[in-house]
Amino acid sequence: MDLLAELQWRGLVNQTTDEDGLRKLLNEERVTLYCGFDPTADSLHIGNLAAILTLRRFQQAGHRPIALVGGATGLIGDPSGKKSERTLNAKETVEAWSARIKEQLGRFLDFEADGNPAKIKNNYDWIGPLDVITFLRDVGKHFSVNYMMAKESVQSRIETGISFTEFSYMMLQAYDFLRLYETEGCRLQIGGSDQWGNITAGLELIRKTKGEARAFGLTIPLVTKADGTKFGKTESGTIWLDKEKTSPYEFYQFWINTDDRDVIRYLKYFTFLSKEEIEALEQELREAPEKRAAQKALAEEVTKLVHGEEALRQAIRISEALFSGDIANLTAAEIEQGFKDVPSFVHEGGDVPLVELLVSAGISPSKRQAREDIQSGAIYVNGERLQDVGAILTAEHRLEGRFTVIRRGKKKYYLIRYA
C-alpha cells in the first residue's frame, strides 16, 4: 500500500487537488510539504493532532515536512469555519504563543533524519518585513475580488460581515505557500478540511506567478464524534497537548472514554498501529466490547505519543488506583493529577478528628450526618474504609505529608491539602 492509499485507508484524505498527479509525485520523488498552525492560544490541542501526525506519517515515508507557525497570520485571524470576527491578539501575546507552539511541534517530528530532516518555520519572518505596496503589487494583483468572494470562508460571512483584515487572510496564506515553494521547493500543502479555500488560493498564486502547476493540496477531514458533540471538548473544557493545561491522566481518560462507534476511526487517525493490528482490535470490539481493548490501545498509544512512556505509566497507575480504591500507593504528583478537579479543602493545623474534618471540609453537612456516614461504612480515607466515629487523622494519614484523599460513598472524592 503506497502512502496515499494508506492515508485513504485511515480516512485521512478529505480532498486532493489532483489525486493521480499527487500519487505519482509521492511515489517517484522525495516531496517537501508543509502544514500551518496559527497560534490562537498558548498550546495546541487535540483538534490539531490529526494534521501533526499526518506530517509525521509523510516523514516516516521518506518525505520532508515543514511545520509552519503562523506568527504573522495569527495576528490577522483565519475566518475559515468561524461565524464571527476573531478578537485580535496583541503582538507580544502571539509571539509568546508562537514560541510555545514551536516547542510542542518539535516533539512530533525528526529534525536529525538522514536525508529528510523536518523544519519549523515562522511566517512572521517573511510577512513581517513585507510593506503594503509590495504586498498589493506582488500578491494582491493576482487575486480578483470575485474569486475571493466565491470562497466558502468568505461566503459564510457575507450576512454577518467580514472585515478587510480577515478577508485578506487567504492572500497571506497563499503567499506562505508561494514563499515555501520558492525557498524550500515545497510542492504540497496539507491542512484541515476548512483550509481547502486557502490551500487552493496558494496553488492559484503559484500558477499565476510561476506559470506552472506543479504544486498540490490535500485536506484532512474534520474529526467528528458519533454522538454529535464537538471532538476535543469535554465538560471541563478543551483537551490540550500541554500537560500543564490538560494533565496526562485527563488526556488518557479522554481517549479511554471513546465511544465504541468512534474508536476504530480514531485508531486509524491518531495511532501508528498497522492495518492488521487495528483490524484485530476491531474484531475484538465486535466479539467482546465490554473488554474495551480498542479504547485501551487508543489511550495508551496517543498518550505515549504526546506525553511519553513515563507519563503514560503514571496515567495508568492513577486510573487503576481510582478504580480499585488503592490510593495509598500513589505519589503526591499522581494525586495532584488524578484529583485535580475534585473538591478540595485546606486544613491548617495538626491532628484532627475525622468527624470534625468531614463537616469543616463540606463532605458531610453536620456532625450527626458525619457520624452516620462513618458508622454505615460510607467513608474511606486514602482508600481504606474507616468506621470508627472516634477516629483521629494524624500525620500517618497524610500521603507524602501533603494530602489525604477522602471518599464518601462510591464515587464522591475530596482532597484534603495541608497548609
Curated annotation (Swiss-Prot):
Motif 'HIGH' region positions after renumbering to this chain: 39-48
Please give the superkingdom of this protein's source: Bacteria
> Predominant location of this chain?
cytoplasm
One GO BP annotation of this record: tyrosyl-tRNA aminoacylation
**Residues involved in L-tyrosine binding:** 34, 169, 173
Q: Where does ATP bind?
A: 233
Q: Where is the S4 RNA-binding domain?
A: 352-419
The entry lists its GO molecular-function terms as:
ATP binding; RNA binding; tyrosine-tRNA ligase activity
Q: Where is this motif: 'KMSKS' region?
A: 230-234
Q: What is its EC number?
A: 6.1.1.1
Q: List the Gene3D superfamilies hit by this protein, alphabetically.
A: HUPs (3.40.50.620), RNA-binding S4 domain (3.10.290.10), Tyrosyl-Transfer RNA Synthetase (1.10.240.10)
InterPro entries from the entry? aa-tRNA-synth_I_CS, aa-tRNA-synth_Ic, Rossmann-like_a/b/a_fold, S4_RNA-bd, S4_RNA-bd_sf, SYY-like_C, Tyr-tRNA-ligase, Tyr-tRNA-ligase_bac-type
Which positions, given as ranges, span the membrane? none
Q: Which SUPFAM superfamilies match?
A: Alpha-L RNA-binding motif, Nucleotidylyl transferase
Using the UniProt record, name the top-level EC class of this enzyme in a single word: ligase
* Reaction catalyzed: tRNA(Tyr) + L-tyrosine + ATP = L-tyrosyl-tRNA(Tyr) + AMP + diphosphate + H(+)
Question: Which compartments is it annotated to reside in?
Answer: Cytoplasm
What is one cellular component GO term in this UniProt entry?
Answer: cytosol
Question: Family, per the entry?
Answer: Belongs to the class-I aminoacyl-tRNA synthetase family. TyrS type 1 subfamily.
Physiological role: Catalyzes the attachment of tyrosine to tRNA(Tyr) in a two-step reaction: tyrosine is first activated by ATP to form Tyr-AMP and then transferred to the acceptor end of tRNA(Tyr).
Q: Which PANTHER family has this protein been placed in?
A: TYROSINE--TRNA LIGASE, MITOCHONDRIAL, TYROSYL-TRNA SYNTHETASE
* Assembly, per entry: Homodimer.
What protein name applies here? Tyrosine--tRNA ligase
Natural source organism: Geobacillus kaustophilus (strain HTA426)
